[in-house]
Amino acid sequence: MVDNNKTVDNNYKHTSVLLDEAVKGLNIRDNGIYIDGTFGRGGHSRLILSQLGPEGRLIAIDRDPEAIEAAKQITDPRFSIVHGPFSDLAHYVRDLDLVGRIDGILLDLGVSSPQLDDAERGFSFMRDGPLDMRMDPSRGLSAAEWLMKASADDIAWVLKTFGEERFAKRLAKAIVERNLTQPMTRTKELADLIANASPFRDKHKHPATRSFQAIRIYINSELEEIERALDGAHEVLAPEGRLSVISFHSLEDRIVKNFIRHHSRGPQVPAGLPLTEAQLRSMGGRTLKSVGKMMPGDAEIAENPRARSSVLRFAERIGE
């Protein structure tokens, strides 16, 4: 999610990545019911609302308290906001008795530009602030708290698994040694330590890039959240309902791609297995079909460099 909204009033300017394409992929119906699972600062939600008819409905979700405050600026009666993780979207839909009636779901994954650009949130190695990184600061351990209690092996596993950091063990050892003598509480402290401990310099990338990504993903359980959200979307979509997902790195995109592929194939039956037609029917068939993917063009990347790694994938629920 890279959403460069400047203010939270109704007239603000924004640069949501693949904005038009992601919403167009939902195939908006005038009276449809839609979910924006990652409200952010509302770029996608506002565009969806502009295309809905008077009987349409949009349910937005976000776990970031600042996003909830931004959503309060929207007074449209067709719009409602839920404060919570998008991984619980099926739960929210069940409470509303709308399972099987959702015409489209949009998920814009990862961290948003307002979160990155606010030093007090602790997401960025480019700005000094509290070493926090939580999407919802009221829940769970901050990055500083986790790094203080985690072992070098645990930290190395996180850096390797979620950041694909080649020097994970070396950096983890340096983090633990530093915290034993002078606990880190600021993003600049962690970024400087990683820069000094890393034996390799990439002139195009800060040495702390992968480590900050990895710690953020772990602290917020981002990949597990994505898996649960996709399963929930599959449960609640109406026949011919659309799923539109924007990812920003290979770990996210791999989950989305594999999810769509899995539900597009139907049951995999070993050759020669003796099954009756009734048994085959009971196993069900494919429940999704892929309707393509997109990446930002050169013009969008030039305007918004953070869009460079984004991938937009679409799927459609097959009617039953």
Curated annotation (Swiss-Prot):
Record-listed E.C. numbers: 2.1.1.199
Leading EC class: transferase
Pfam family, one: Methyltransf_5
GO biological process, one term: rRNA base methylation
Catalytic activity line of the entry: cytidine(1402) in 16S rRNA + S-adenosyl-L-methionine = N(4)-methylcytidine(1402) in 16S rRNA + S-adenosyl-L-homocysteine + H(+)
Database matches in InterPro entries: RsmH (IPR002903), SAM-dep_MeTrfase_MraW_recog (IPR023397), SAM-dependent_MTases_sf (IPR029063)
Gene Ontology molecular function, alphabetical: rRNA (cytosine-N4-)-methyltransferase activity
Principal localisation: cytoplasm
Keywords: Cytoplasm, Methyltransferase, rRNA processing, S-adenosyl-L-methionine, Transferase
Subcellular localization, as worded in the UniProt entry: Cytoplasm
GO cellular component, one term: cytoplasm
UniProt record similarity statement: Belongs to the methyltransferase superfamily. RsmH family.
HAMAP family with a match to the protein in the record: 16SrRNA_methyltr_H
PANTHER family from the UniProt entry: 12S RRNA N4-METHYLCYTIDINE METHYLTRANSFERASE, S-ADENOSYL-METHYLTRANSFERASE MRAW
Summary of the function given for this chain in its UniProt record: Specifically methylates the N4 position of cytidine in position 1402 (C1402) of 16S rRNA.
Name of the featured protein: Ribosomal RNA small subunit methyltransferase H
Native source organism of the sequence: Yersinia pestis
Gene expressing this chain: rsmH
